Each structure stands twice: as structure tokens, then as C-alpha cells.
Amino acid sequence: MFDKLQAAEDRYEEISHKLSDPDVINNQDEYKKYMKECSDLEEIVQKYREYTKVTKEIEEARELLEQTLDKDFREMVQQEFQEAQEKLEVIKRQLKILIVPKDPNDDKNVIVEIRGGAGGEEAALFAGVLFRAMAKYAEKKRWKYEILDSNPTELGGFKEVVFTIEGKGAYSRLKFESGVHRVQRVPSTESSGRIHTSTITVAVLPEVEEVDVDINPSDLRIDTYRASGAGGQHINKTDSAIRITHMPTGIVVSCQDERSQHKNKDKAMKILRSKLYEIAQEQQINEVAQDRKNQVGTGDRSERIRTYNYPQGRVTDHRINLTLYKLEQVLDGDLDELIDALITTDQSEKLGSGSDDEG
């Protein structure tokens, strides 16, 4: 591990010198590239320097303790020695996490798809509840969200809703929401008070740039139609809604939330790019995958990841066996406790799988 940390510090020093080179400063593309690399390395290098400083303090304290000292001074040095050792253990743990390879998509914006599954109108209603929870979470993080496409129901739910969330690190925190979410509650229409179980599926995709995915225009079939609202009534008198079919894969995306056909097409292409990128990523992962499944989950949309039980006020994440009796707060957008626990487990898994390499 320490060879990697020293190499990171050496590279950081090298880049810092390059950033003061007039030739680099005058080349904006090169300058931006080095600035990004410098920013990516900064946290781990600062933490490694802190580790080196504390290690030196421990050595100095140890040397003093080997000398003949008066009682009061020895006690003071002994206390400093113990505190420095405890601090060093904390820094070591932080460094282990920082050295875990970062998901290249972590800083990206996301496209989220929520679809009602088993349970009819109840599933559609909960799709709306979960959409609002994620929208509130985005607001708490000061991220921006925008609906790209939706199929609302008359009772205020969604058969399907597709939206973007824009903000630094959005994918790093929301990627764990992909999968099947199960809700257990008594529907308002249920006179006997019987609990119903419904499911919805969530897919979280990193938003990708045009340069990340090559799409041949001849592979696309583009259809226009009139946008419709809840219950199917037409809300626009022109054919502004767009449906794009990517013929090689059969992927179909649509967007009807803008009045402009051009804007709807741009948004639909944004969704398509992310879907094609996801397929390419999955193929790449499968090629290098080990014969194990992460405890946090594969991100498979068919995997049941979480249950929301209204009568008990309970939320259970099945991937990490975490239960919180904070249903109301979670659905009000307080997702950090769940997400932090998932990230911690994911990092521990990655550290465990990489421990053999550290020899």
C-alpha cells in the first residue's frame, strides 16, 4: 500500500511543477487535464503526509521514552505517544479507503427511472412517493432535478417516471438505489385493513457525454406523437413528444415533458446514451468479473434491495441487513444514513477483495 501512496505523492509533486510551467498554462486542454489529476490526488496525498508526520512524532516520542526521564515528563510523553498511535490507526483506515480505486462514474450526474411493478395502482402511488423522496434528497444536497418523461396516473402516482439529478457526486451516492423496492401498507381503498405488498423497480444510470458513446444515426428510428397526461388525455395539440428506437439493441426511449420537439429529442438522446453506456459497462464488468457477488449487491434491477413497511414504520435494506424505524424521515428525503451504510460496506468489500494484492 505504501508504495502506491509514495507513487501518488511523487506524481502529485510532478503535476504541481507542470502547473507552473508556462507552456502548460498556455495550453488550456493540457492545463485542465493536469488540474483534474492534481485535484483527484490531493486528498490522498494530504492524508499520506499526515501519516508521515504522525509516524515521525511516534518515533521521536519512543526515543524520548528510552531515555532516563523524570516521572512527570515521562507521563506526558507516554500520553502523547499513545494518542499519536491511536491517531495513526485512524489515518491508516482512512488511507485504505482512499486507495480503493474510485468508480470513474462517481462524480457524474444521474438519470433515474422509477417504474411501478406488481401491485397496480398501489405500485404506481409508491413510485410517486419514492420519486418525491429522491427529489427531496436532491434538494437537501443542493442538487438540481428535472423530469424527462413521465406516465402519471389519475390518483397522483406514476406508472413510470424518468428524471435527471445533477450535482457533483450524485452517482456515487444514488447508484445503490438500483433494484426492486417493496412496499407493505394498507391501501386507502382497502376497507378491511388488509396489508398489500407492491413492488417498484428503480434504475440509476450515470449521465454520459456524447463523446462517451458512439451512436450511428442510421441505427435510430424516431417517431413523433402527441404528449398525454394522467388518464391518457392529450395535453398538447402538436406532435412534440419523441420516441426513439435503437434498432441494434431494441432499446426504446421517449420524452414528452417539453413543448418543443427539439428539446424532447435532446432529452431522449440523453437517456439513450446512458442506457447504451450501461450495456457497454456491464459487458466490460462481466469480462473481468470474479466468481463472487458483492454483498451490497450487483445493481441488478431484479434484485429485491429494500422493504418499506408502513404499519411498523420500518425500512429494511436487505443487502446489508440494516433496519431503521424511520420510515417517515426516509420518505422525506433523509437517505444519508442508509446510503452511508451501503458505501461503508461497499468499501469494506473492495478492501477485502484487494487485500491479497497488498501481500
Swiss-Prot record:
Compartment annotation: Cytoplasm
Keywords: Cytoplasm, Methylation, Protein biosynthesis
A GO cellular component annotation in the UniProt record: cytoplasm
Main localization, broad class: cytoplasm
InterPro entries: PCRF, Pep_chain_release_fac_I, Pep_chain_release_fac_I_sf, Prokaryotic/Mito_RF, RF-1
Keyword Cytoplasm: yes
Modified residues (N5-methylglutamine): 233
Example of a GO MF term: translation release factor activity, codon specific
Mod. after translation: Methylated by PrmC. Methylation increases the termination efficiency of RF1.
Matches recorded under PROSITE patterns: RF_PROK_I (PS00745)
Primary role: Peptide chain release factor 1 directs the termination of translation in response to the peptide chain termination codons UAG and UAA.
Family, per entry: Belongs to the prokaryotic/mitochondrial release factor family.
Protein name per its UniProtKB record: Peptide chain release factor 1
